[in-house]
Amino acid sequence: MTAIETKRIGSITQIIGPVLDAKFPPGQMPNIYNALIVKAKNEAGEDLSVTCEVQQLLGDNQVRAVAMSATDGLMRGLEILDTGAPLSVPVGEITLGRIFNVLGEPVDGLGDVVAKTKSPIHRNSPTFIELDTKLSIFETGIKVVDLLAPYRRGGKIGLFGGAGVGKTVLIMELINNIAKAHGGVSVFGGVGERTREGNDLYMEMKESKVINEENLSSSKVALVYGQMNEPPGARMRVGLTALTMAEYFRDVNNQDVLLFIDNIFRFVQAGSEVSALLGRMPSAVGYQPTLSREMGTLQERITSTKQGSITSIQAVYVPADDLTDPAPATTFAHLDATTVLSRNLAAKGIYPAVDPLDSTSTMLQPWIVGEEHYGTAQRVKQTLQRYKELQDIIAILGLDELSEEDRLVVARARKIERFLSQPFFVAEVFTGSPGKYVSLADSIKGFTMILNGELDSLPEQAFYLVGNIEEAIAKAATLKE
């Protein structure tokens, strides 16, 4: 060890769960966000290496840092080394088809990653002059999304929903469709979700050839996991690790990248777990007082530049289905489109359970999507809204008490509701029906035909779980037989 490195060694003075304090020699203090490394041996004599990130300078030559892995086996007095730089992770094609942890170490058992380039996970967002401002739609092949709440290329999209309404399945379908239809690269950040789901996603991707086991570099996705069992430090930073990998594809390879974050709420939750240990006074509902800043720092780096774009799709767990909770409310401020998943639709068996009236998009404007698309979407929403208003009357008095006109609205609304469902490629295993990719033009055509009354004679079950309108007509013919 050189003389310079010797100077940068401190010692641990206190450990409180995932947070530890260390004392350094005068004038040798590490900077905020520097990575510190503790090397030790546990009781079994195995080597331990714990990486921490400096969060606070406490005075009296002490710093407070958050550990990225478990602090079991560490004790006071152990040496701690200042690396002199923030955490850096591998970037580039070498990351495709692999699973990394927050430190950029592969955790898939396929050997080490020898990266030509590493990037620090903390960096500034692009400057104003680097940003690209042109508006264009990102077609997903999912009817309800493309028609009613279209995604913006280089935008941020929130997937809102409680537990078990299908957020992760929708994300898997999007990765699949984007890889097949756009040939784009995706980066998936698993932030504080179930390890089983992470494993299922990986296996699913291998089966659908999104990850190519024979030739990993031709894979379409890099995975970064910091799951529920990880300490809060890892869950707080794993989103930045995934974002750093996505930024390289955008800035250096000039690609359009999809960044999935599942789940952005867990990023906030991890921040709130360490906030109190860092000595900060809690804010509303016990969240960290720095909530807006932490969210803004992450979100402002996700954007389109002159080089390429990062389109981000973020699953947002809504605690107790309360959209006014500070975590989802802070996330809302950054989004271009919201896809809200509804428990009522899931209970009816309509998948994807996207709520057509609650989901919104800033892209649904006639001068962006065109008059035909805008007009069809508005008519679909009006029909569904009228049906919603009539539901109380139907529940109390029955359908027969409605006027002829309202009965027609209800019949068409029920067809629209069913036609908004769609078989997914990634759900073929469960449903047995092959997945369908529906182009935007086909979606508009189908809904226009229903609204114009051209299909009033068909039974409503013909519209359930089909792709385009031709399939619904064919299904109606087989139902008659």
From Swiss-Prot:
GO BP terms, alphabetized: proton motive force-driven mitochondrial ATP synthesis
GO cellular component terms, semicolon-separated: chloroplast thylakoid membrane; mitochondrion; proton-transporting ATP synthase complex
Keywords, in A-Z order: ATP synthesis, ATP-binding, CF(1), Chloroplast, Hydrogen ion transport, Ion transport, Membrane, Nucleotide-binding, Plastid, Thylakoid, Translocase, Transport
Enzyme type, top EC level: translocase
UniProt GO molecular function: ATP binding; ATP hydrolysis activity; proton-transporting ATP synthase activity, rotational mechanism
Record Gene3D superfamilies: 2.40.10.170, Bovine Mitochondrial F1-atpase, Atp Synthase Beta Chain, Chain D, domain 3 (1.10.1140.10), P-loop containing nucleotide triphosphate hydrolases (3.40.50.300)
EC number(s) recorded for this UniProt protein: 7.1.2.2
Its membrane topology: Peripheral membrane protein
Pfam families: ATP-synt_ab (PF00006), ATP-synt_ab_N (PF02874), ATP-synt_VA_C (PF22919)
Compartments where found: Plastid, Chloroplast thylakoid membrane
InterPro entries in UniProt: AAA+_ATPase, ATP-synt_VA_C, ATP_synth_F1_bsu, ATPase_a/bsu_AS, ATPase_alpha/beta_chains, ATPase_F1/V1/A1_a/bsu_N, ATPase_F1/V1/A1_a/bsu_N_sf, ATPase_F1/V1/A1_a/bsu_nucl-bd
Domain of life of the organism encoding this protein: Eukaryota
Main location: plastid
Binding site for ATP: G161, G162, A163, G164, V165, G166, K167, T168
Catalysed transformations (reactions): ATP + H2O + 4 H(+)(in) = ADP + phosphate + 5 H(+)(out)
CDD domains from the UniProt entry: ATP-synt_F1_beta_C, ATP-synt_F1_beta_N, F1-ATPase_beta_CD
HAMAP family: ATP_synth_beta_bact
Sequence similarity: Belongs to the ATPase alpha/beta chains family.
Record's subunit section: F-type ATPases have 2 components, CF(1) - the catalytic core - and CF(0) - the membrane proton channel. CF(1) has five subunits: alpha(3), beta(3), gamma(1), delta(1), epsilon(1). CF(0) has four main subunits: a(1), b(1), b'(1) and c(9-12).
Role description: Produces ATP from ADP in the presence of a proton gradient across the membrane. The catalytic sites are hosted primarily by the beta subunits.
Protein name, as recorded: ATP synthase subunit beta, chloroplastic
Gene source species: Mesostigma viride
